[in-house]
Curated annotation (Swiss-Prot):
UniProt GO MF annotations: rRNA binding; structural constituent of ribosome
Taxonomic superkingdom: Bacteria
Protein's UniProt keywords contain RNA-binding: yes
Cross-referenced CDD domains: Ribosomal_L20 (cd07026)
Alphabetized UniProt keyword annotations: Ribonucleoprotein, Ribosomal protein, RNA-binding, rRNA-binding
One Gene Ontology cellular component: ribosome
Name of this chain's protein: Large ribosomal subunit protein bL20
Pfam families per the UniProt record, alphabetical: Ribosomal_L20
Gene Ontology biological-process entries: ribosomal large subunit assembly; translation
Record-stated family: Belongs to the bacterial ribosomal protein bL20 family.
Function summary: Binds directly to 23S ribosomal RNA and is necessary for the in vitro assembly process of the 50S ribosomal subunit. It is not involved in the protein synthesizing functions of that subunit.
Length: 117
């Protein structure tokens, strides 16, 4: 059986990993063995953080809505409860946006929530 030399394949694989590790500090961007581990770990962090990003944005929206609602004399939970009772179906992302950029509209929503309670 003929001897198979794998230099081309190994070189391509190493190049791919080192390209993915470009910009990493020190050996993590230069040494294949270290770079491979760094790329694997980076992938794990990316996978985890794609899920965490959704939670963190929701937390941010809730904090913003709570702050704006309290300026109008209502807690977050009572505000959301009032909106549900008034059958206002605006999600937290849009509510947070309104709270930051359109204070008048948010005040109107708070009044609507208060009247529904």
């Amino acid at each position: 059986m003929a001897r198979v030399k794998r230099g081309v394949i190994a070189r391509a694989r190493h190049k791919k990993v080192l390209k993915a590790a470009k910009g990493y500090y020190g050996a993590r961007s230069r040494v294949y063995r270290v770079a491979f581990q760094a790329v694997i770990k980076a992938g794990q962090y990316a996978y985890r953080d794609r899920r965490q990003r959704k939670r963190q944005f929701r937390q941010l929206w809730i904090a913003r809505i709570n702050a704006a609602a309290r300026q109008n004399g209502l807690s977050y939970s009572k505000f959301i409860n009032g909106l549900k009772k008034a059958s206002v179906e605006i999600d937290r992302k849009i509510l947070a946006d309104i709270a930051v950029f359109d204070k008048v509209a948010f005040t109107a929503l708070v009044e609507k929530a208060k009247s529904a309670l």
